[in-house]
Structure formats: C-alpha cells, structure tokens
Amino acid sequence: MKDMKMQSSPETMMTRIPTPDPHSTGVREDAMDSVCKPWKLYENPYYCSSQSQQHQHQRKAFIWDLNFIKVFMESELGKAQDEIKELKAELDYERKARRRAELMIKKLAKDVEEERMAREAEEMQNKRLFKELSSEKSEMVRMKRDLEEERQMHRLAEVLREERVQMKLMDARLFLEEKLSELEEANRQGERERNRMMKPKILERACSSPARRRCENPQIKRGINPFPRVMRAIRSKSEKWGSKLECQKVQLKILLRQKTTPRCTPLLSSPPP
C-alpha cells in the first residue's frame, strides 16, 4: 500500500506544482550568486561568457528541482505525519488494550489465587475428613471385634448356663429319685407293718364269729339295722403315702418336661414328707 502511494505521489506532485514566486526566485538566485560566484579572468563588470550563462541555466534548474523536491518532501512529510498520527492512535489503542489486559490479568490472578486458596482449604478439609473416616473405620472395626468377643462370651455363658441347668436338673432328678425310692421303701414297710398288725385282728374276728352269730339280732338277719351309726372314713397311712408319691411323680414329670431352674428350687427347698 505504501509502495503504491509512493509510486502515485510524483504524478500527483507534478500536477500540484505551483508557479514559482518571482520574489522568492530572486532571493534564491542572489543566494546562489553569493555562494557560487563564477571565476572571471578580468574584473570586468560587463564581462559575460557562455560559461556564466550555462551556470545560470544550471542554477535555475537546480532551483526548479529544489521547488519540486520541496513540494514532494512536504507531501511526504504530510504522509509521515498522518502515519505518525495513525501510529499514535494505534499506540494509544494498544496501551489501552494492554491496560485492560493487565487489569484482566490482575483480576484473573486474584481469582486464581482465591481458587487456589479455596482448593487448599478444600484439600485440608478432605484430609481432615479422610482422617476422621479412617479413625471411624478403625473404631468400627474395634467395635465389631469387641461385639464378636461379647457374642462369643454370651454363647459361652449360655452354654455354661445350660450345662449348669442340666447339672441342677440331674441333681434334682437324682434327689427326687432318691426320695421316691425312700418313699417306696417306707410304703413297703408300712404295708408290712399294717399286714403284721391286721393278722391278730383277723384271727380274733375268726374266733369270735360263731359266738357273734349266736347272739345275733333277728333284725340284722333280715337286713334291718336297729342302731344306725355314721362311721367316719378312716384312711390308712399307706393310702396317704401313696397319694403323696403320686403327686411327687407328677411334679417330677412336669419338672423334667419344662427343664427350668425356678421350678426345681421349691422342690429342692421343700422338706421331705
């Protein structure tokens, strides 16, 4: 773009060349005369040679070239000034953009710092929670182990309690069997005593039966009781012992069926009959 401007600028400058000012050209010619005086063979003021004329033509061409170069340089200076203005505007825009970018970078850095601090706080929180979780897990493992030990102890206690109950039941059974055997032995002895005591009475009744038949009332023969009496029912000791024996047998069966300790305590504490 700049090359095109540079190529088109001389043509535009040729079209824009102004007419030279005679006063300014005269001043320039006097300056050139004072600077470049031709050498004269004689100090003749009317001396004029062809070289001086040629020199004057060269001087005019030089002045023309200077005017052309001045216009060209002025146009180039205007372009340069415009470019400088554009560059200044771009520089200002770049500075503003850089300031905005710096502000944005500062803001992002602040956000990043906040995010980093938040992440560090979260990591510390996660570490603390992980430590608490690990401690809770270890506590749970310990509690499970203690619970398992307590369960084993309870099982062992149950087994020991069951064995103790079985032993107590066995002792109660042996005690009741012993008592039952004692009761049976006492029952047999009572039967023997009763039989031994009943034999003389039977003999006496057998001996006194003929005499009693002789003096028997005829009403009794006919089935009439002249003196009715109410006789009290007398139970023998053997019947009493038999009923107690049956009751204790029933209690023993209930005790062996239920197999509970509270049931056997009153039996063990009760005195033998």
Swiss-Prot record:
Disordered: annotated span: 1-30
GO biological process terms held by the UniProt record: trichome branching; trichome morphogenesis
Deletion phenotype: Shows trichomes with no branching.
Any coiled-coil regions, as ranges: 69-199
Domain of life: Eukaryota
Keyword annotations: Coiled coil
Compositionally biased tracts (Polar residues): 1-12
Functional description taken from the UniProt entry: Acts as a key regulator of trichome branching. Could participate with STI in the same pathway. Also plays a role in integrating endoreplication levels with cell shape.
Self-association state and partner proteins as the record states: Interacts with STI.
Protein name (Swiss-Prot/TrEMBL): Protein BRANCHLESS TRICHOME
